[in-house]
Every structure is written in C-alpha cells, then in structure tokens.
Regions:
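C-terminal motif of bacterial Sec signal peptides marking the signal peptidase cleavage site
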Residues: 17-20
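Solvent-exposed loop/turn segments flanking beta-strands in beta-repeat/beta-sandwich domains
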Residues: 54-69
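Helical hinge/lid and interdomain linker segments adjacent to catalytic or ligand-binding clefts
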Residues: 122-231
C-alpha cells in the first residue's frame, strides 16, 4: 500500500514539472551580425579604415581594436575612422566590431596595415610667424642659412606644429631676436604663442622631440612647461645696441676663478670653434669668439642664477643649484664672468614627461646679422649652430 502511494506521488510530480516547463517562454540568443568589407587606404602615414555596417536592429556603434587593444569606440552608424601617423615598417592589425544596444558585441573583422618607409628624421626651422617678409633681419639670416645648409630640412609655420612628429622631424630650431620686444614668453610673436601651438610644442618635446631655442626664443622653455614660470630667463635685453671695439666671446669654463670649475670646452657643441686668447680679450683663458667689433644689438635672454626668484639652492653654488632644480647643464656664460653668476647656454636634459632635450642659447653675442658689417666671427656662429643641431639629433 505504501509503495503504491509513493508511485502515485512521483507520477504527479512529473506531471507538474512537465506542465511548468511548457509554460516557460525561453528567449533565443540574438545573432549579432558583424561588419563586412573592412579595408584601408593610406595617405603618407595616415590610414583610413572603411567598412560596411550590418543591416540589423539595435546597432549602436562600433569598436576598433589595434593589435588586440581598444583604440576607439564610435557611436552611431559610422563607416570610417582615421588613424593618424601610424608606425612604419611594422605590421599593425585593426579589428572592427559592431556593437548593439543590448550590450552584445559582434565578432570582429580584421585587416593588416603596413606602411613601409626608409625616410630618416629631418631638422626643422620653426618660423615665429607665417609671413617671412615680416621677420627680423637676424631671424631672416638664420632662416637663409638653414635653407642653404639643410636642403632636406623642413621650414615650419606655427600652424604646422599640429602635425609635426619627432620620428619625422627630430629637432626644431626656433630663432626670435627683435629690438623692442618686451620680456616674457607671452610677448613673443602671437602666432608662435597661440595656445594650440604651445600645446603642440610641449607635446612634441614630451614625445621625444628636441628643441634649439635661440635668443628671445629661450623663453619658450617655460612656455611649454619644461621649467616653471619663475625659472624662465630673467636676464633680458632688447635694445638697439651700439658700437663696440671689443670681441664678444662665450666662456665655457663656468666658475673660471672659483675653487670648483665646470669645464665644458670638450662638449660637442664647441667642436672646431675658433677661440680668442686671454691676452687679447682679458677674459679667463681662451674663449669662443662669436661677434667682432662694430654695431651690435646686445640682446640677452638668459639666466641670472643669483636672482632669488629662481628659488634654487646656493649649495655648493647657484650654478649647481640651478642645474639640480631644472635637470640641466650650464654650458656657457658671458666671457668676462669668472664666478657662478650667469647661464647663457643651457642644455635642459630629458626630464619626467619631457622625453626630448631643449638646448638654449641666450647670449647677446649670438647675433646672426651684424648690422653695419660682416661679423668677422660669423663662421663660429654658424658652426656653433650646426654643432648644436648635430648634438640634438644624436
């Protein structure tokens, strides 16, 4: 009897179970259609991906992966995407997936992109403004020399900086030298210090690009954030200048009369430069001649390291304090300076987010066009510049 009751209960439970399953509406898994016809076209190093979207309901956008890592998420019925300045001589795999508003993502379609190139990085000259006819005579002389000596070099306008990359242009020279230009980087030519141009210059150095900043352009080292504003060049002049009979030279032994000297005469930027002996100048030792007698503008844009606004240590001296605070090397000062006063040529090393190097020449003697005659030491100006550009591209 007990056995029959148990059998009856079991049959009843099975019946209930079957009835419950038949009442459940099981949803089928949606089929996520994928994109088709994925292809690319290349314009130099810019690559445009194109594809066809599936004809499916609920499509919300696409996802693009580069070598398996998310590169972009695009909303809506998008059928193309631009990848700017892709790496050369390497295989890159782009995968495009369709995304749906139910949260599902389709399988991807993949295309291999390869741009072959044997081009080498070039030197660049950044104009302070696009209109060359408005350049100062010293800026024009520097530009003419650059064009003559770097036929493969690139002359850039400020507007070009948005599309400049260190692997194509590894170094950029900026020369600004003007009578009557007030101190402060915001007083540099307006095109040069536009917000987008300063941001592009900063990104250029952060990505490993190198800058040569000469005369009033040395102030850009603060504009791009490589040094703080209070450590911008603070020894400044912009007057018309005057006649002189002496020779203006650069002293590469910083602290010449001090207990601890910093001798940079073997540095690469001085290779081959003509020196003038102490017997002729009265300065400490042999110094590097940059400008001979005649009419000279006397424009400085450098650092007085004794100025307390720099907020640097004076231990063991202000030159070392400046170098430590800014991760730099002071390579030269005025030739007549025998102590630790001033920094006229400064090499700012790669530092933190700034992977590139910034080399500044702010000495008054670095004048590209002596107004009343040919500078008898013009060859030293030119060789110093060439050496600096060679040093920066290493």
């Amino acid at each position: 009897m007990k056995t029959n009751i148990l059998k009856t209960m079991a049959v009843a439970l099975v019946g209930l179970s079957l009835a419950a399953c038949s009442d459940v509406d099981i949803q089928s898994t949606p089929y996520s259609e994928k994109v088709t016809d994925l292809a690319y076209t290349a314009d130099g190093r810019d690559v445009t991906l194109t594809w066809q979207l599936p004809q499916a309901e609920g499509l919300s956008g696409v996802r693009i992966d580069k070598d398996g890592t998310l590169a972009a998420e695009l909303d809506g019925a998008v059928t193309s995407w631009l990848a700017k300045h892709v790496a050369v001589n390497t295989d890159i795999y782009y995968t495009v997936k369709a995304c749906y508003d139910n949260g599902l993502t389709s399988e991807g379609q993949t295309v291999k992109v390869r741009i072959d190139s044997d081009a080498k990085a070039k030197a660049g000259f950044l104009l302070p403004q696009a209109d060359e006819s408005t350049l100062d005579d010293d800026e024009k002389a520097a530009l003419d020399w650059f064009r003559a000596n770097y036929p493969d070099g690139v002359v850039l306008t400020p507007a070009d900086m948005a599309d400049v990359y260190p692997d194509e242009i590894s170094e950029i020279w900026v020369q600004v030298d003007r009578v009557g230009m007030p101190q402060g980087w915001r007083n540099l030519p307006s095109e040069l210090v536009a917000d987008d141009v300063i941001a592009a210059l900063a990104n250029y150095v952060k990505n490993g690009g190198n800058l040569l900043l000469t005369k009033h352009a040395t102030q850009l080292v603060a504009a791009i954030g490589r040094v703080s504003e209070n450590r911008a060049p603070n020894l400044y002049s912009d007057g018309a200048g005057g006649e002189g009979t002496d020779i203006w030279t650069a002293q590469a032994i910083v602290g010449y009369d001090m207990t601890e000297r910093y001798d940079h005469t073997s540095h690469a930027i001085y290779k081959g430069l003509v020196t003038v002996p102490e017997s002729q100048t009265g300065f400490g030792g042999d110094t590097y001649a940059l400008e001979g007698p005649g009419m000279r503008e006397d424009h400085n844009c450098m650092w007085d390291c004794n100025n307390t606004s720099l907020e640097i240590s004076n231990e063991p001296n202000v030159i070392k304090g400046f170098e430590t605070a800014t991760n730099s090397t002071v390579l030269a000062t005025w030739a007549h300076v025998r102590d630790y006063c001033c920094a006229g040529i400064v090499d700012f090393n790669p530092d933190g987010d700034y992977l590139g190097r910034v080399l500044c020449i702010g000495l008054n003697a670095y004048e590209w066009n002596q107004n009343d005659r040919t500078n008898e030491y013009q060859s030293n100006i030119e060789l110093l510049t060439k050496n600096c550009l060679d040093y920066l591209k290493q």
